Every structure is written in structure tokens, then in C-alpha cells.
UniProtKB/Swiss-Prot annotation:
It comes from Schizosaccharomyces pombe (strain 972 / ATCC 24843) (Fission yeast). InterPro entries: ACX-like_C, Hydant_A_N, Hydantoinase_A, Hydantoinase_B, Oxoprolinase-like. It holds the Pfam family Hydantoinase_B. This is Uncharacterized protein C11D3.15. GO terms for molecular function: 5-oxoprolinase (ATP-hydrolyzing) activity. Signal peptide: none annotated. Belongs to the oxoprolinase family. One of its GO terms (cellular component) is cytosol. GO terms for biological process: cellular detoxification; glutathione metabolic process. It comes from the Eukaryota.
């Protein structure tokens, strides 16, 4: 008898399902612990052994090697690679890279993971040592060339070659093979056996990398991970980190596979050592691969990928085509994914803190699961992200654990102890402990009630239910994000629940999302293993391209596909598939010229019209298309599938259509339990799923249980039993419209305070996604340089998605100012626009649109969207000149205008303001991208309307008075948290005032005295003594100071409090008129937003003695050509580039500073070296840590960086930087850090014809005219040290314990980009 075995080895449990060719024979299901060393060495082998015992009807000793003669195939998923990555237990490996980039992966994209964490905790690199190869290539042409010159190769210059992408590559320096061999031999002699290799531009020119690999193989390295073979895609950093991940993980995976194979007779081979039984492993992309081809890089999401395949192929009907959301809720986290007829892949993700460039299913892990811990913090219910883990686990596990979501479900009657095996307690022989859970909830309830008024006292049931509501909201938000980010309407989806804990939450989450139907498969708790049975064996092949997508290139593209198809076919034929069993999917990875947003476009079934498919997908995801913009093909990809032999089960829709349904017989209920739902406990029938006939209808409230899952059917919901699924239909009645009960309650409900806090924040987040979707500029659409927020009727901030620290306090200043100006003058259909620093703006490129929402004649609330526009005129492209002295030189100024009047967009007025007015300034120009300005402003208006619609829906759900009441309450909650902080600070400082001062490089002084009231925690932040307005551009609008204050308060509280106006309610700010923190209306301010904001932050933190100074700077570098000629007025075509450069962070008590990272008020990413050189005529010669530039101390300050850029053509360059004169200060005996330097390496030709190289310090702020061959070398400041150096202990230097979730797909990408601006 031939058996097919499918195994998912998870973190806690290993699941297995065995099926037979005779489909009348029921499958065998096995569930066992993944780790049980006292009983077995390997859980997967043990699962096979138990299955074979059942199949063969005989006992098989654990010591006996397993005979595979009756096995048709083995298919496995494993967390071995994931766990090694999460726990940092991979192979010791070395990294081989191009000279000048030894710290490239340490710096990464220069952003920090958490913008509100003073002690920056960045994941450590995976390699143990770096070797630099003295070689270099670059791309000869550059994309932004206004003349569009294309180099052709005629053989006259042997250093020019054509790369795999079709681009011309210049070989500047070849590999010195003798020196490399010597270095690699020394490395090998140190004991290294695994290396990762990534050289600059090897995605298109692999020759040097292949040579390194050849020499390494000759030296004797057993594992050589070449980035060009793993994933030949542009972007050095993610490709390099992918190579190091493979070098780190593949030896671990191979050892595991060798151990696995050794458990079988002849090691899964025949007696004559030829290939034996088929054995395949699941890869991160949802495809299977032969056991001997399974590698570390592609194993990271092996288990979760099986779950996606499982739910996709069991829940989606190809005829009905209803898309499905996968909801996989486990113990520590929840995985969210989507399927709409094809697998959705991402090609650059961050997994376990490591950026991976490899095809992975778009799986998004949320820090909420059954084991998520429950907290009462600052008057709010908080779920996670901390987890109780398996040990000690939840309280009910009887191991002295913590209160968790599982405990809440148990207390409320949603889990039945009798349905669980007796595996708990110290001897693992007891049932779940309800009584201990109840006692712990009663303790927590007493703590909560101690801070509540008598009439608002809560029961333990209410507290537990409150945590369930918060957990559900936490999990619902990323599901909204996943669908909306791709332009889908969430309400037309189904929700498919799987995983051990999903059944208790899926109906409530569906209701929250507006989803009407939930599917729960009969194998939902082992769906990842079941997915292995349904999956195909896959071979993915791709290569880079630089083709333009047009008819002239179609034949060339077809030839490239043919070549890739042969390679993919050969891979699958080697694994035993015949040509008739192989199918192919063809893809082009495309983007518009000048953008980074790529879309993976599949070939239409009946044509080669990729262009129309690109238009359709771009329109869906982003809301628009460019008719006349070139479409660039970055990659050509083939996915070849060897088709699975498993027959598909009947679809849900077919069963719903064919079956006749009847109400359940009450006699089938095993018991009746009092289960808590909204409002109280309700008698609810409990049914065993095994006893429910197909075609049965079960009304809620009820529980449906089997051996591995519990499904909650809430009141008004209806469950239907199919052959393969339980289908739950959700009622969507409005519970609060009639009585507005929350508003009538005499006190604030802390549960709904937490719910509303989350929902208000979700409004701001969804506004942001709407803005990103409908905008057209790179700044907004790709860098996500924007903020969206919700305000009450007075203009007070209610919720601001915390992506841009410099916007946190300033947007409320802006809205309050505009509300006052237009008081009584606004009407429905009006939208305001402003960017002026004296009216709540930060700098001119940040334009804010404000929309009021009316009820009758009364404004109920405002929404606002602020976006950074790439250019709004002024004396230099980018509207950020380093030499501006007056505001008018920096571009268009808009004090207060109506952008929309009675629903009509005022386009002519905006053209006048953005284009005509700035051009009247001497040396100035109107906006250089007016069309983008207008389109992005319309996108901002649309985002505001999205916010109004969402709040209107919230009002419909909970009632107007409740929403308005909780808008106020959430501000009061933040106010309370800040007051508690300030009272604690006053006590620490023994009632003394806090004082600090700092200096800008021109000597201008920032003075701050903080006085805290001992009674109520009120505080005065008094900046008296600060220098007068500056004749330059480091003046900071008043709103910037408010942003710095709210940012500092948030990091000092160090907990996730609501960010709103309440944070500033205890604060009185005194800023003298006409000082450079409150300049006049015409003062230049561009440096205030990007430089002075950092120094205000340093000064505040210095007063609190919280942190040594960080680099106090953002190192703004711009260069370009073209624009308006100041002498002739002629506008010449050109380009412009802008970047900010990281430095060192200041040390804090207990923690070293971090090197090469952005701090405080900025968190922008830096352009990848390969993208930089492809787009612009530059060579990045060096980007390394500036060693020992951080201040010494008990805790050392972080080091700055050195960034060396060589120019290949003449350009105009501007630098706007600080801390070139005043050192970043140390604290509590810690030493100051090194100042920064900006060095121009200039090549002058003397009259004699000789070349002289000069090194010129250009100072902190300057404009230089660089010639071809000149370099700019930016050496950024470090961070100050903390504590006396004599007390340093080297064992306590770095932050550890960063929480990494296993899968970070689309949602994480959006959050990362937006948190890095």
C-alpha cells in the first residue's frame, strides 16, 4: 500500500497527515511535540515512524531505520532555518565584499528599527569577519542623464563590457587573484568553512564574484554563497544580507537534512545508492524542492508557506473567484496573508531582522497570539507584544506563567479544559487550570478598579473580555492594511482561519472588518502539513534586465524567456518530472522610469501584452497611470511548476450549492456552558465537530470543538457544516446606533478607551495608505514622506500615525492656527492648504491640507494630510538651498488658502501660488514639478476624505457623542501619562529646575529651563536666553520646538502611549519672540527643520540627563546639474539628488550608543550604492564606520560614518550640516564625540600640466562646483559617551533582544519605509 506523508515541523508542534491513493481510506493525522529529547531525536522521523506503524499494523522500534518501500513520497516543512535565524544559532561565516564597503551591512539603510527608543537596538550582522576584495566595476551610463546618452561597445576600450541586464559595465579594477587567495587561505586557516560573497554590481556583472567563488572552492571552503547565483537583483545591501543569511543557514539546514535522511534505510536512497523515495521540502515561495536542493535562504518561511498553500487551495473557488484572507493564529504570533487566484510574492523582506532578497510568499506576522501577555498600562488595556512562550506559558499551564489571551478565553468559557489532553503542570499530567487563571484575573481586576470611579468598577469577566477585544483589534489592523495597500476592498473577501487559536477569534475579527463569511477547514489546526500535500514542486529562475517595455523589444524578451525556460525545465526534469507535467508562469518585474515601485506582472494568457497588464495593476494598486512614461523591465522571471499528484477536494462554493441544510438536533450537544459575550454570560451549546452531520446548521452562541481546535460561534452568527469546512456567516447589525450607550455612561470605559485609541490611530494609518495610493511623486508614493492625522473640533491632535517625528506636534499647531483664522467662515466642501512656517509649518516643501467635517453648521472634527513635495520653486532645485537668507528664496509660501471651495479644486490659484509667485523672486524659479504638486495635492484631499469617511463609519457604529467623548478621553489619557513622567522627574531631581544649553556651529545658543509643579505635574519649558533670529537658514519655526518636545516626552515615557494633544497639555512653552526658535515671517528656515530640530532635541534630553548628545545633525547633501541659469534665465535640463547621512547615537545609562544610524527627528533611508550609481554619474568609493569618533565612557557613544563620493561629470553640490565646530557632548563623565568634517578632494591642473590634489575643508554649510574626478568626503559626528571611561565593562556594550517576527511582508515594508523618513 502506497502512502503519501506530509509533515510540518513547527516551533512547538509537529503535524503530519498521511493520505492514500485509495481516497476511500481516511487520512492518518499525527500531532506531536517538536522537541521531546527523552523520547525521540527528531520529530519528523518520529511522525513517519508512527504513521508506518499504523499503515503496516506492527510496532517499529525507535532505534530501527525506517523502510520507505511503502512510501510514495515525503513532503516536509521545517522551522530549522527560521529558528536558527531567530535565535542566532547559525554557522560561523565570513563576508567577502568590494573594498570600501566592509561596514555596508552594519550600516544597512541607516535607519533605526524603533523611532521612539533612545537605546537603539539594531539586529547584529550574521557574519563574524569581513574580507575586502580590491576590485571595482560600475555602470557606464546613468539613468538620469538629460541627454540620454547610450554607450555602445566597439572593442576599442577593453574595460567596457555588456552586463547580464544589457547595461554597459566599466571594469575599473580587476581582482588581484594572488592577494585574494592569500586572504582566503588565512580565513580558512582560522577555521571558517562558510563564506558569503557579494561584490558591487554583481547582479549584472558576475565575473568577479564567480572568480572569488572559484578560488574559495580551491582553498577548500565547504559552503560558498554567491549573491549573483542566489538572486541576481539590483540593490547591494539586500543581496549581500541574503548571501550572508544563506552562508549562515545552509550548513545548519544541511546538517539537519543529513540527520533526517539518516533515520531511513539507506538514507532515503536505494541499496545501490541511487535516488530512492521522493522527498521534498517546502520553500518560502510556496513551492516544493528536492531535499538535496533545499537551501538556507529559501527555507526561512518553509512552515508558514505550507499554510498559505493549504488555505489557498482549499478555500478559493476558481469559478466563483471570491478572494480569501488567511488568518493563522498561533501561540506567540499571527500570520496574515491573501490569495485571489494566484500566490502573492514579495522579493525584498525583513525576516528576523535580516533583509532578504528572495521570492517569498507575502506573509505578515503580527505580534499577537494565544500566548500574548496582558497588561494594564497608563489606564489602557495592552495586549503583547511580549509573549509568555511555551515555558512558563499562560497561567493556566500550571507553570507559574503570565496572564495571556489564552487565559482570557479560558475564563470566558471559550476554551473547555476537558477538550484538552492532560499535559500541563510540572509533571505534564494535569488539565488546564481555570482556578489559577480566575485568581490572577481577579488580582488584575482589583488593580484596574483601584484607579476607576466606583460606578465604573469592572468584573473579572469584563476585564478578560476587554483584552479579547483589544487582541482582535490588534489582529484586524494588519488585515486591513494588507488588503488596502494593494487596492482591494476588504469587505468582498472571505476570512479563512487556521492555526491552533484562530477559531476563538475569527468570527469577531471578521465582523470588525466587515467580512460576512468565515471558513474553517476540518484540518485547520494542521493546515500547513495539509498544504504540503497540495503544493507543486517549483523551480524559479530570473535574471536582470534594462529593457524598455515596448513592441520593439518583444522578440528579445521572448528569447530571454526561452533561455530561462530551458534552465527551469532542466531543474525539474532532474527531479523526476516529464515535460508534460511541467507548467510555466512568465513574469516581468516592471516600473515606470524614474520610480522605484516595481510591479511583478504575469504574462496574459492569450497575448504578450504585458504593458496593458502593467497599466491595469498600477491602476488598481496606485489609482492612476502615466500614459507617456517609459516602463522599464528590471527583471525577467520564470516560475516552473511540476504539478502535484494530489487531487483537490470539492470547493466550498460547490458544497454550499449542492448541500441541503437543516438545523442541528439539540440532542447532539455534549453540554451547555455559560460563555461570556458582549454584555454578559449566555448559555451556549457545545458540539463535537465529529458528531455533526454534513448539512447541519448551528446557530450562535455555541462552541464547536474537536481534538485540536475550538470554534466560537457568537450570537447572531450561523455555522454550516460541510464535508471539508465549517462555514460561519456573520451578522453585521449596528449595536450602538439606537442608544449611544457609551456616551450615556457616567464614566469612561477603559476597554473602549483602548479600542478607540486603536481605531483613531487606524484612521490616520488608512488615510496615509490612501495618500500613498493616489499620489504620483516619488517622495510621497515611494519614500512615504508624509503624515496624516485626526483632530477634534478645536484643532487638538487626536491621533497622528507616528512616522515623522518632526510632524508630531507641529500639525496640531497648524490646524489650530487655520481653524482660528477661518472660524465661522468654512462650509462643507471646503479644504484649506498651508505651508508657511509662521502658520504651523515646518519648512516650505511640507504642504498641509486640512478638511473640516460638519454636522449641520457645526464642525465636529478636522482631518489633515501633510506631504513633502519634491520641489516648490526657490533658488535651487529641491527647495532646500544651503545658502538661503530669506524665506522667499526657499520656494512658494502659502499662509492660508482654500484649496477646495464647495467641492471644486482651485487649480488656477494653486498654479499662481506654486509657479508664478516664486518666479518673481530674484534668482528664483517656480515649481520645477508643478504637475506632481497638483496631483499630490489632490491625493492629499482624497486622503482627507478617506479619514472623514472612516470617522463617519465609526460614528455610525458607536454614535456621535461616544466618538466625540472618546476623542477627548484619549487626550486625557496621554496627558495623565506625561504628568506621571514629569512628577517622577521632579522627584529624581529633588525639586530643582532642569537646565541645559547647546550651541549651533555659528555660536547661536539654545537655552532651556524646565520647571515642574510638584502638585500636578505641570511644567514650563522656558527657552529664554536663546539667540536672536539668524541671518541664515537655521531658524526653526515655533512648531518644530513643539514637535521636539512631544518626541522627547514620548521617548522618556518609553511606553506606547497615544500620541496626541494631551502630551502637551501639562506643558507651557515660553519662546521669546524673534529668537531663532520663533523667527519672523520672512526668515529662512530650511535648516531649522533638518538641523536645528536635532539640537533642540539634544538640549531637551540634556536637561533631563537622559542621553548623551547624538550626532545632532542630518548631514544634508544635494548635488545636480541643470535648472535656471541665473545669468540668462534659460532653463536647462538636468537632475537633482538629495540624501541625509547617518552618524553616531549618544550613549545612555546601561547601553552603548549605536554606530552609523539616524537619530531623533529623522530616520531617512539612504540610497543603495547600486541604485545610486545606476541613476547618477557618481562612484561611491567608501561607506564605512568612522572608527573611534564616538565619545569614550562607561557606555561608549556610537561612531559616525565616512561617505566618499566621486563625481564622473561636473556638478553643483551643496552641504547643509552641523556639529562641525561644537562636539556632541558626553554625559555624567562621558567624553565628547568627534565633530564632523566635510572634505572636498579636488584635482587642479597646474600651468605646467601637472595634476595637484587638494583636500579642502568646506565647512558645515557650503556650495561647491565639483569637476569630474573630484570627491566629497563626508565624515559625520559620533555620539557622546555616558559615564566615566574608567568604569567601562566591555561585557555590557550593546543592545540585545530585538524582537524579530518571522515574516514581514507588504505591511512591514510600508511601515519600515514610513518609519524611515
Amino acid at each position: 500500500m502506497s502512502v503519501k506523508i506530509h509533515i510540518d515541523r513547527g516551533g512547538t508542534f509537529t503535524d503530519a497527515i498521511a493520505t492514500f491513493a485509495d481516497e476511500s481510506r481516511p487520512p492518518i493525522v499525527i500531532k506531536l511535540l517538536s522537541e521531546d529529547p527523552s523520547n525521540y531525536k527528531d520529530a519528523s522521523i518520529e511522525a513517519v515512524r508512527r504513521i508506518l506503524e499504523i499503515v503496516q499494523g506492527k510496532s517499529i522500534p525507535r532505534t530501527e531505520k525506517l523502510d520507505t518501500s511503502c512510501i510514495n513520497h515525503l513532503r516536509c516543512g521545517t522551522t530549522v532555518a527560521t529558528n536558527a535565524l531567530l535565535e542566532r544559532k547559525g554557522e560561523r561565516c565570513a563576508f567577502i565584499t568590494t573594498k570600501g564597503f566592509k561596514d555596508g551591512l552594519l550600516i544597512g539603510n541607516q535607519s533605526r528599527p524603533n523611532i521612539f527608543e533612545l537605546g537603539i537596538r539594531r539586529p547584529e550582522v550574521l557574519y563574524s569577519k569581513v574580507i575586502e576584495v580590491d576590485e571595482r566595476v560600475t555602470l557606464e551610463d546613468y539613468v538620469e542623464d538629460p541627454m540620454k546618452v547610450k554607450t555602445t561597445i566597439d572593442g576599442s576600450d577593453p574595460s567596457l563590457v555588456v552586463g547580464r541586464s544589457g547595461e554597459v559595465v566599466r571594469i575599473m579594477k580587476k581582482v588581484d587573484c594572488d592577494a585574494l587567495r592569500k586572504d582566503l587561505q588565512a580565513l580558512y586557516d582560522e577555521g571558517f568553512t562558510s563564506i558569503a560573497v557579494c561584490l558591487a554590481h554583481s547582479f549584472t556583472f558576475p565575473d568577479h564574484e564567480l572568480l572569488v567563488g572559484k578560488i574559495a572552492e580551491e582553498v577548500g571552503f565547504s559552503n560558498i554563497s554567491l549573491s549573483t547565483k542566489l538572486m541576481p537583483m539590483i540593490k547591494y545591501v539586500p543581496r549581500a544580507t541574503s548571501a550572508t543569511a544563506d552562508a549562515y543557514l545552509s550548513p545548519v539546514v544541511r546538517r539537519y537534512l543529513a540527520g533526517f535522511q539518516s533515520g531511513f534505510l539507506h538514507g532515503l536512497k536505494t541499496k545501490d545508492n541511487s535516488k530512492g523515495v521522493r522527498c521534498e521540502f517546502m520553500q518560502s515561495d510556496g513551492g516544493l524542492v528536492d531535499v538535496n536542493k533545499f537551501s538556507g535562504l529559501h527555507a526561512i518561511l518553509s512552515g508558514p508557506a505550507g499554510g498559505v498553500v493549504g488555505f489557498a487551495l482549499t478555500s478559493y473557488d476558481e469559478d466563483v473567484k471570491i478572494p480569501v484572507i488567511g488568518f493563522d493564529m498561533g501561540g506567540t504570533s499571527t500570520d496574515v496573508s491573501r490569495y485571489g487566484g494566484s500566490y502573492e510574492h514579495v522579493f525584498e523582506t525583513t525576516t528576523a531582522g535580516v533583509t532578504i532578497q528572495s521570492p517569498q510568499l507575502d506573509i505578515n506576522t503580527v505580534a499577537a497570539g494565544g500566548g500574548s501577555r496582558l497588561f494594564w498600562k497608563n489606564g489602557l488595556f495592552v495586549v503583547g507584544p511580549e509573549s509568555a512562550g511555551a515555558h512558563p506559558g499562560p497561567v493556566c499551564y500550571r507553570k507559574g506563567g503570565y496572564l495571556t489571551v489564552t487565559d482570557a478565553n479560558l475564563l470566558l468559557g471559550r476554551l473547555l479544559p476537558e477538550s484538552f489532553p492532560k499535559i500541563f503542570g510540572p509533571n505534564e499530567d494535569e488539565s488546564l487550570d481555570v482556578e489559577s487563571t480566575r485568581k490572577e484575573f481577579e488580582k488584575l481586576t482589583a488593580e484596574i478598579n483601584s484607579g476607576l470611579e466606583k460606578e465604573r468598577q469592572m468584573t473579572a469577566d469584563e476585564v478578560a473580555f476587554g483584552f479579547i477585544k483589544i487582541a482582535n483589534e490588534t489582529m484586524a489592523r494588519p488585515i486591513r492594511a494588507l488588503t488596502e495597500a494593494k487596492g482591494h476592498d476588504i469587505s468582498i473577501h472571505r476570512l479563512t482561519s487556521f492555526g491552533g487559536a484562530g477559531g476563538q477569534h475569527c468570527a469577531a475579527i471578521a465582523k470588525s472588518l466587515g467580512i460576512t463569511q468565515v471558513l474553517v477547514h476540518k484540518y485547520s489546526s494542521i493546515l500547513s502539513a495539509y498544504g504540503m500535500a497540495l503544493a507543486d514542486v517549483v523551480s524559479e529562475v530570473q535574471e536582470p534586465s534594462s529593457f524598455t517595455l515596448d513592441d520593439s523589444n518583444t522578440e528579445s524578451i521572448k528569447k530571454r524567456f526561452d533561455s530561462l525556460k530551458e534552465e527551469a525545465k532542466a531543474n525539474l526534469e532532474e527531479q523526476g518530472f516529464t515535460e508534460s507535467q511541467i507548467s510555466y508562469e512568465l513574469f516581468l518585474n516592471c516600473r515606470y522610469q524614474g520610480t522605484d515601485s516595481t510591479l511583478m506582472i504575469s504574462k496574459p494568457l492569450e497575448s504578450w501584452d504585458f504593458k496593458q497588464s502593467f497599466f491595469d495593476k498600477h491602476k488598481q494598486e496606485f489609482g492612476f497611470i502615466f500614459e507617456n512614461k517609459d516602463i522599464i523591465i528590471d527583471d525577467i522571471r520564470i516560475r516552473a511548476s511540476g504539478k502535484s499528484f494530489q487531487s483537490k477536494e470539492p470547493s466550498v462554493d460547490a458544497q454550499l450549492k449542492e448541500l441541503k441544510f437543516e438545523p442541528v438536533q439539540k440532542s447532539l450537544a455534549t453540554c451547555v456552558k455559560d460563555i461570556y459575550f458582549e454584555g454578559g454570560r449566555v448559555p451556549s451549546e457545545v458540539y463535537s465537530l465529529d458528531n455533526l452531520p454534513v448539512g447541519t446548521i448551528v446557530n450562535g452562541p455555541s462552541l464547536i470543538v474537536d481534538k485540536t481546535q475550538t470554534i466560537v460561534v457568537p450570537p447572531k452568527a450561523v455555522a454550516r457544516i460541510l464535508h471539508t469546512h465549517v462555514v460561519i456567516d456573520i451578522s453585521h447589525g449596528n449595536e450602538y446606533t439606537a442608544n449611544d450607550s457609551l456616551a450615556k455612561a457616567s464614566t469612561i470605559d477603559p476597554i473602549y478607551l483602548s479600542v478607540f485609541g486603536s481605531r483613531f490611530m487606524a484612521v490616520a494609518e488608512q488615510m496615509g495608505r490612501a495618500l500613498q495610493k493616489t499620489s504620483v511623486s516619488t517622495n510621497v508614493k515611494e519614500r512615504l514622506d508624509y503624515s496624516c492625522a485626526l483632530f477634534d473640533a478645536k484643532g487638538n491632535l487626536v491621533a497622528n500615525a507616528p512616522h515623522m517625528p518632526v510632524h508630531l506636534g507641529s500639525m496640531s499647531t497648524c490646524v489650530r492656527t487655520q481653524a482660528k483664522i477661518h472660524e465661522g467662515k468654512l462650509k462643507p466642501g471646503d479644504v484649506l492648504v498651508t505651508n508657511h512656517p509662521s502658520y504651523g509649518g515646518t519648512h516650505l516643501p511640507d504642504i498641509t491640507t486640512i478638511t473640516p467635517h460638519f454636522e449641520g453648521d457645526e464642525i465636529m472634527f478636522y482631518v489633515a494630510a501633510r506631504a513633502h513635495h519634491a520641489d516648490i520653486g526657490g533658488i535651487l532645485p529641491g527647495s532646500m538651498p544651503s545658502s538661503s537668507k530669506e524665506l522667499s528664496e526657499e520656494g512658494a509660501t502659502i499662509k492660508s488658502e482654500k484649496l477646495v471651495v464647495d467641492g471644486v479644486f482651485q487649480e488656477e490659484r494653486m498654479i499662481d501660488l506654486l509657479y508664478n509667485e516664486p518666479a518673481k523672486v530674484e534668482g528664483g524659479s517656480g515649481s520645477r514639478c508643478l504637475r506632481d504638486n497638483l496631483n499630490d495635492l489632490k491625493a492629499q484631499v482624497s486622503a482627507n476624505q478617506k479619514g472623514i469617511n472612516l470617522i463617519t463609519s465609526l460614528i455610525k457604529e458607536y454614535g456621535k457623542n461616544s466618538v466625540l467623548r472618546y476623542m477627548k478621553a484619549i487626550q486625557e489619557n496621554a496627558e495623565s501619562a506625561v504628568r506621571q513622567l514629569l512628577l517622577g522627574v521632579r522627584e529624581r531631581f529633588l525639586g530643582e529646575d532642569l537646565y541645559a544649553e547647546d550651541h549651533m556651529d555659528d555660536g547661536s545658543k539654545i537655552c532651556l529651563r524646565i520647571t515642574i509643579d510638584e502638585e500636578n505635574g505641570d511644567a514650563i519649558f522656558d527657552f529664554t536666553g536663546t539667540t536672536e533670529e539668524i541671518y541664515g537658514n537655521i531658524n526653526a519655526p515655533e512648531a518644530v520646538t513643539y514637535s521636539a518636545i512631544i518626541y522627547c516626552l514620548r521617548v522618556l515615557i518609553s511606553e506606547n502611549i497615544p500620541l496626541n494633544q494631551g502630551c502637551l497639555l501639562p506643558i507651557k512653552v515660553i519662546i521669546p519672540d524673534n529668537c531663532f526658535l520663533k523667527p519672523s515671517e520672512t526668515a529662512a528656515v530650511v535648516g531649522g527643520n533638518v538641523l536645528t530640530s536635532q539640537r533642540i532635541t539634544d538640549t531637551i534630553l540634556k536637561a533631563f540627563q537622559a542621553c548623551a548628545a547624538s550626532q545632532g545633525d542630518t548631514n544634508n547633501l544635494t548635488f545636480g546639474i541643470g535648472g535656471k541659469d541665473p545669468e540668462t534665465g534659460e532653463v536647462k535640463p538636468g537632475f537633482g539628488y538629495y540624501e541625509t547621512i547617518c552618524g553616531g547615537s549618544g550613549a545612555i545609562d546601561g547601553l552603548d550608543g549605536t554606530s552609523g544610524v539616524h537619530t531623533h527627528m529623522t530616520n531617512t533611508r539612504i540610497t543603495d550604492l547600486e541604485v545610486l550609481e545606476r541613476r547618477y554619474p557618481v562612484i561611491l568609493r567608501k561607506f564605512i564606520i568612522r572608527e573611534n569618533s564616538g565619545g569614550a565612557g562607561k557606555y561608549k557613544g556610537g561612531d559616525g560614518v565616512i561617505r566618499d563620493i566621486e563625481f564622473r561629470i561636473p556638478v553643483t553640490l551643496s552641504i547643509l550640516s552641523e556639529r562641525r565646530a561644537y562636539h556632541p557632548y558626553g554625559m555624567k563623565g562621558g567624553k565628547d564625540a568627534e565633530c564632523g568634517k566635510n572634505i572636498w578632494i579636488r584635482k587642479d591642473i597646474l600651468p605646467s600640466g601637472e595634476q595637484r590634489v587638494r583636500q579642502i575643508n568646506v565647512g558645515g554649510k557650503n556650495t561647491c562646483h565639483m569637476q569630474a574626478g573630484d570627491h566629497i568626503v563626508i565624515m559625520t559626528p559620533g555620539g557622546g559617551g555616558y559615564g566615566p571611561p574608567s568604569e567601562r565593562v566591555d561585557t555590557v556594550k550593546k543592545a540585545n533582544g530585538v524582537q524579530h517576527f518571522r515574516a514581514n511582508g507588504t505591511i512591514s515594508q510600508l511601515q519600515e519605509i514610513q518609519h524611515t523618513n
